[in-house]
Amino acid sequence: MNGMEARLRRIIRKETGRSLVVAIDHGMALGPMTGIVDLKTTVTELDATNTIDAWLITKGMYTHAFEPAGKPGIIMRASGAATIAGPDLTHEGITSSVEEALRLGADAVAASAFIGSAFEHQTLVDTAMMATACHQWNVPLLGVMGLGKNNEEKAKDPKFIALGARVGAEHGADIIKTYYTETDFDKVVAGCPVPVMIAGGPKCETDLDTLNMIHGALQNGARGIVMGRNVWQSPHPAALLAAVEALIHRNFNVREAAQLLESRIHG
């Protein structure tokens, strides 16, 4: 086993080949949000479920507001510097280094690229160069394949999402985070040689919608989730995590997961 394999095992469970990653990096662009205003409390409550394989977090929050009792994997955000107050959320740049991530104790690094946006070229260059730096240290890179405002309607377009997933892998990402397309997602997975994990995207209306989305993705080859709002903005995030973990690692169907969710809520 080399360093890359060892670190990937901190993110993806060896037994199932899947992963449940909770993303808590939203504040870097969106500021305080319902569910992560008090990030330290949220982390403590969700960590207590013992369901989370890894967290996606920024270096600032990792340093100042992250105290899990367990030992989950850590994926450190290495791109950002664009907010909702600015002209374009896709105008990200590199904000950290592999060396800094390793000093902080991270197991992997994440960088965004925005396919079809005005900043496609620069964010892909940044992703490729970050991949080069990561691989010098045997550190996995999570490629976060974003869209941008002009392409939001393409979040369900299998051809467009497949393009992004493949391009991310071509530029060196070891894991891809992208959107679930509902149709032909198996083709997205088939065209990408590295594990594909789904983002939550906009908040689902109900927890059952979240379970259906995750189950559909898993059935079509997704290797898990990298999800934020649909977890920590749920009315019952701890109960939902138990149900999601059962979908991902115990092959529950939606009915079984929904029953587990209800039992955790009312039990």
Where in this protein do the model-derived segments appear?
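Histidine/acidic-residue-rich catalytic or RNA/ligand-binding cores of hydrolases
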Residues: 210, 235-244
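Alpha/beta enzyme core
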Residues: 14, 19-198, 204-227, 245-246, ...
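N-terminal basic/disordered segments at the start of proteins
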Residues: 1-14
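A short, acidic, flexible beta-alpha connecting loop/helix-capping segment that sits on the rim
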Residues: 229-233, 262
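Extended terminal accessory/targeting regions
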Residues: 265-266
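Alpha-helix capping and helix-loop boundary segments enriched in small/acidic/polar residues
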Residues: 155, 232-235
